[in-house]
């Protein structure tokens, strides 16, 4: 076998490189900790908001009314996603295939591909297979597949509010074998419903935390990509 020659920098340069990379690693560690703390803060606030330990007030300073306990079928019409023809699906978004397809997955919010048609305009979807009970507010026309559960509000509701509250529910599978959740099973779960105005205040507050979490997540990814690029340049 032939010899492999390694091009090594001087010890002084090696020390500078190691120090610089350590600083980048420390930055990534700090951002990761910040992301964890923000996520924990959101979780804690959700518990307090949905248990009504913390209440918002109306814009005029008055107190909102009492929340009303309801089963989900009293608030939503619940349907299940089905199949879609292969000819109606594209992996790439185009002017024709412009509607997102969502399936039963907790990755990338269940995104599957693009369709040339939609089934529902706005709804909350809930995973009914695998990792059960993950709710996502869908605020644009979409097509659900693979038995993804779709909650269509009977009257005007804030979808983000119900996304967050459903995600706090302890949803368990009633079937043996592969975990699954059916529309009739989901319909019996109970939630507490405030006025639409209070729903919106809670949803906006939680969305503001989500935005901060997303910014930090992007910063972490950018720092990791930057480090990767630096390493590639250094050792070419």
Segments the model singles out, each with a brief description of its role:
Residues 1-2, 103-166, 174-178, 182-186:
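A short beta-sheet element
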Residues 4, 84-86, 111:
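Short Cys/His-rich Zn2+-coordinating modules
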Residues 7-70, 192-236:
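Amphipathic alpha-helical coiled-coil/heptad-repeat segments
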Residues 11, 58-84, 91-105:
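Non-catalytic DNA-recognition/assembly elements of restriction-modification systems
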Residues 49, 76-79, 166, 234:
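Hydrophobic aliphatic residues
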Residues 84-89, 174-177, 221:
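A short, aromatic/hydrophobic, helix- or strand-capping loop or linear motif
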Residues 91, 180-183, 224:
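Short amphipathic alpha-helical segments embedded in low-complexity Lys/Glu-rich regions
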């Amino acid at each position: 076998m032939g010899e492999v020659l390694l091009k090594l920098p001087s010890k002084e340069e090696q020390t500078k490189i190691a120090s610089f990379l350590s600083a980048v690693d420390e930055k990534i560690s700090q951002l990761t900790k910040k992301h964890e703390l923000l996520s924990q803060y959101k979780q804690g606030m959700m518990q307090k908001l949905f248990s009504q330990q913390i209440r918002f007030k109306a814009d005029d300073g008055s107190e909102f009314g009492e929340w009303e306990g309801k089963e989900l079928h009293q608030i939503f019409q619940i349907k299940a996603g089905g199949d879609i023809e292969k000819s109606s699906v594209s992996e790439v978004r185009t002017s024709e295939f412009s509607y997102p397809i969502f399936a039963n997955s907790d990755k990338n919010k269940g995104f599957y591909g693009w369709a040339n048609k939609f089934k529902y305009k706005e709804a909350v979807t809930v995973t009914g297979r695998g990792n059960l009970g993950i709710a996502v507010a869908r605020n644009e026309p979409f097509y659900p597949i693979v038995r993804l559960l779709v909650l269509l509000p009977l009257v005007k509701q804030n979808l983000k509010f119900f996304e967050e509250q459903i995600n706090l529910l302890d949803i368990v599978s009633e079937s043996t074998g592969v975990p699954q959740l059916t529309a009739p099973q989901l319909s019996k779960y109970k939630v507490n419903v405030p006025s639409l105005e209070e729903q919106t205040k809670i949803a906006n507050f939680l969305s503001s935390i989500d935005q901060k979490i997303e910014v930090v997540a992007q910063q972490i990814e950018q720092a990791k990509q930057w480090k990767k690029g630096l390493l590639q340049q250094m050792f070419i």
